[in-house]
Amino acid sequence: MKQTSVAPAQGKLGILVVGCGAVSTTFMTGVLMARKGLAKPVGSMTQYDKMRVGRGADARYLHYSDIVPLASLDDIVFGCWDVYPQNAYQAAMYAEVLKEKDINPVREELEQIVPMPAAFDKNYAKRLDGDNVKCSMFNVQWSMLSRWQMVEALRKDIRDFKAQKGCSRVVVLWAASTEIYVPVCEQVHYQLSDLEAAMKADDREHIAPSMCYAYAALSEGAPFIMGAPNTTVDIPAMWQLAEKTKMPIAGKDFKTGQTLVKSGFAPIIGTRCLGLSGWFSTNILGNRDGLVLDEPANFRTKEVSKLSTLETILKPDVQPDLYGHGNDEDNQYYHKVRINYYPPRNDNKEGWDNIDIFGWMGYPMQIKINFLCRDSILAAPLCLDLCLLSDLAARAGRYGIQRFLSFFLKSPMHDYTQGEEAVNNLYQQYTVLKNAIREMGGYEPDEEID
């Protein structure tokens, strides 16, 4: 490893996960099994990917951990919050993502991961009915905490966890359900002082519970990662808090299945200068995520995230002949996304894509993609990579929006107030990721294709 200014990964790394469902328990179980040598963390860039550093005779292909000081899997300590009280072993068994034989070897460790009461507002996830939630006594009745009380309780949770587990650093990862759509409000979400005032005024319309988690994490010196499409940290006020606390933030929405394919396949259409008339995407999903997304207000949040991918790759304003033909009100290609709750499939999501393209002299063609995937199996390595790389970013003194983590995310954060455009092209994202790691490792950035 070259001389680098990145602080070493000394001591334990606490990973506090919001949610103890299918994704979280698959992530935790996989890490615990991998460090016992009983499973391989396939799909994890930090554990498998190699990149070239140097050129010509000096070129070498190195793992990320040979370039920058990443935390070891052996140093990870897990904790979580959830609205359901079942420990991580019980939750993993309930989720039925992994076989019992792949859970039992780490049963004892999983049983020790007991969810702390969640900061929860049922209005933001109506399909969830757990009672392991933070509340207070008022007039002999239990009531939901105010938003500021949520923040203070969560901050205490983070401090207590860090002290009890002897962690030198903590990362907070949202792997819980999608909340209802919260439009960005300039009067509340643009200035940190306004956001704090709204929290203290218990503004439940504009302050989602996830914002309380993010505020608490950043205030306690922990990077925050948004794995759902929630508005949460995608607001200027949170960017200001991240700048103030000098903490990294990353989001939003894990790029696992259909959007991963879309961000990788759309550039093929674009680089070949083929035209696009329409792209229809539909999914069936039966886990708790699918249940929550069956609620229209929650699906709207996901829809906005999934629809944002194509428009920055296949641009109607740049190539009107190719991408300005469609039948929607914006006179561009037709793009629709649907998710259908189908319990028999559980976590085994299936996605269908119908892509109507046209070529020479406008003659039409079609592409069909059918992806039968396992949602949590694809999400788990993203959780690991995002946590390790966010921790790395913090030790490297990188704070605010971590654009180099866009590779892992469906709707990458960007400063839309300044007209910045998100990068959704998978291959461009991969280049940005590799160059950020090269730079943190003391190597020159490199635009050449490996």
Please annotate each region the language model reported.
Residues M1-F138, W142-A228, T232-K244, L260-G264, ...:
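Metallocofactor- and cofactor-centric catalytic cores in central/energy metabolism, strongly enriched
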Residues G221-A222, M247, C273-L274:
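Short glycine/serine/threonine/alanine-rich loop segments
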Residues N230-T245, I284-E295, T312-D321, Y342-K349, ...:
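Short flexible/disordered coil segments
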Residues A250-K252, T256-N327:
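Conserved anion/nucleotide-ligand pocket segment
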Residues S305-T312, P316-I401:
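Glycine-rich, aromatic-lined ligand/substrate-binding cores of catalytic
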